[in-house]
């Protein structure tokens, strides 16, 4: 039985997978079971910030596995303490709750907001405002928070207590605020919603408004956090600090870990309020700490900013050459999106893969670029050249 046959027979069909089996990786490249190499601009969907088989991360995981993998949160472990110290020293947060994924981190934020609403604001049924086209996860609470009905189909009744408003529209958001509003949960850049950057003026107005109304401002940094945008956290581009923010994806460099981060005044969980069996285990924390230290040692946040500017400029040239099919490019750092005038993103992703470049869509009309933060100038140029070749051979059906 082949790998793909085993998947077909024994793995639930929750993904429409590409017909390729990856067996190894190094740097920004993956190699499939037939020995073919691919330039990886997906990075596990904005996760493998150090690329594949990075020696520091590999050594940290191997060494920790030889020492201690898991004991539960009934006890103290040095790896969790060190990681929490690093995150709070480098961010607006004072305290951290560790879990295993972005959905779990956002689930924790939702619970924190509800407790804040009930115990601090005295709201019997707290409400959370989210944005249309947002994505916060696939658990019942986070898929309800997600502002995309396609992810909610078949899963009603949804969790009550969520209101959705247009992204980057302060007046629309303010109009939905009531005495029951406890929090706003929003992304600095909408990732799955089409790589839509947050507007600075919107977020600064939102920050002031939330402070005035004692509403929690919670940022979902699952995709933007840990250097992806050319700053360590996405909120740094916006000139604000959140009360609460969530991390995952890049935090572990491919090892599952998530984090709910909060300022001390809002870190109101008590024993019994929330928990995670695996959250913050020594193995995951050792991996995440290696990622954090490597981001600094190799100046990868700076690299994300510089290579992001190079990528954005190259995408801009593609926009000019291939109009009207390609409408615009947008993003920050190494989180870029190429916006099409037709729903052909999946087709272009497939054609690019055939030419050895891995990309991922963000909706039917947006191609997303989220390479490892170690990506070089040569590799960015290689990706742009492959993509240019794909567009050059693509039949254009849009009329000017």
From Swiss-Prot:
Using the record's annotations, give every residue carrying the modification N6-(pyridoxal phosphate)lysine: 249
Q: In which pathway does it act?
A: Amino-acid biosynthesis; L-arginine biosynthesis; N(2)-acetyl-L-ornithine from L-glutamate: step 4/4
Q: Which domain of life is it from?
A: Bacteria
User: What protein name does the entry list?
Assistant: Acetylornithine aminotransferase
**Cellular compartments annotated:** Cytoplasm
Quaternary structure (record): Homodimer.
Please name the top-level EC class of this enzyme: transferase
DNA-binding recorded as keyword? no
Query: Whose protein is this, by species?
Result: Gloeobacter violaceus (strain ATCC 29082 / PCC 7421)
Fill in the misc note.
May also have succinyldiaminopimelate aminotransferase activity, thus carrying out the corresponding step in lysine biosynthesis.
Kindly give the CDD domains that the UniProt entry links to this protein. Answer: OAT_like
- Could you list this entry's UniProt keywords, alphabetically sorted: Amino-acid biosynthesis, Aminotransferase, Arginine biosynthesis, Cytoplasm, Pyridoxal phosphate, Transferase
Q: Which reaction does it catalyse?
A: N(2)-acetyl-L-ornithine + 2-oxoglutarate = N-acetyl-L-glutamate 5-semialdehyde + L-glutamate
Cofactor stoichiometry and binding?
A: Binds 1 pyridoxal phosphate per subunit.
Q: GO CC terms for this protein?
A: cytoplasm
């Amino acid at each position: 039985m082949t790998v793909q046959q085993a998947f077909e027979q024994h793995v639930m069909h929750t993904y429409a997978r590409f017909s390729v089996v990856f067996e190894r990786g190094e740097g920004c490249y993956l190699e499939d079971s037939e020995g073919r190499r691919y330039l990886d601009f997906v990075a596990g969907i904005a996760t493998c910030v150090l690329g594949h088989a990075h020696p520091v991360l590999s050594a940290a995981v191997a060494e920790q596995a030889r020492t201690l993998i898991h004991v539960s949160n009934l006890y103290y472990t040095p790896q969790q303490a060190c990681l929490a110290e690093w995150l709070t020293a480098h961010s607006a947060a004072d305290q951290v709750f560790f879990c295993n994924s972005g959905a779990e981190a956002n689930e924790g934020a939702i619970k924190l907001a509800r407790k804040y609403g009930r115990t601090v604001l005295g709201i019997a049924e707290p409400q959370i405002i989210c944005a249309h086209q947002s994505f916060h996860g696939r658990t019942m609470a986070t898929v309800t928070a997600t502002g995309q009905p396609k992810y909610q189909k078949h899963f009603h009744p949804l969790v009550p207590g969520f209101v959705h408003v247009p992204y980057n529209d302060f007046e629309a958001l303010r109009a939905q605020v009531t005495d029951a509003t406890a929090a706003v949960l929003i992304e600095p850049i909408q990732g799955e919603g089409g790589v839509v950057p947050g507007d600075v003026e919107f977020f600064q107005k939102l920050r002031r408004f939330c402070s005035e109304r004692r509403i929690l401002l919670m940022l979902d940094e699952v995709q933007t956090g840990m250097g992806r945008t050319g700053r360590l956290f996405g909120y740094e581009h916006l000139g604000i600090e959140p009360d609460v923010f969530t991390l995952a994806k890049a935090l572990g460099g491919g090892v599952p870990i998530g984090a709910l981060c909060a300022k001390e005044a809002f870190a109101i969980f008590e024993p019994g309020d929330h928990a995670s069996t695996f959250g913050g285990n020594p193995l995951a924390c050792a991996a995440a700490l290696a990622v954090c230290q490597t981001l600094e040692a190799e100046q990868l946040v700076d690299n994300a900013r510089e290579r992001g500017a190079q990528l954005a400029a190259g995408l801009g040239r593609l926009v000019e050459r291939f109009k009207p099919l390609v409408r615009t490019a947008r993003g920050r750092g190494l989180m870029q999106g190429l916006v099409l005038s037709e729903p052909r993103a999946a087709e272009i992703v497939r054609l690019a893969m055939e030419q050895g470049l891995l990309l991922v869509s963000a909706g039917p009309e947006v191609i997303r670029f989220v390479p490892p933060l170690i990506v070089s100038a040569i590799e960015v140029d290689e990706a742009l050249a492959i993509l240019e070749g794909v567009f050059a051979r693509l039949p254009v059906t849009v009329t000017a």
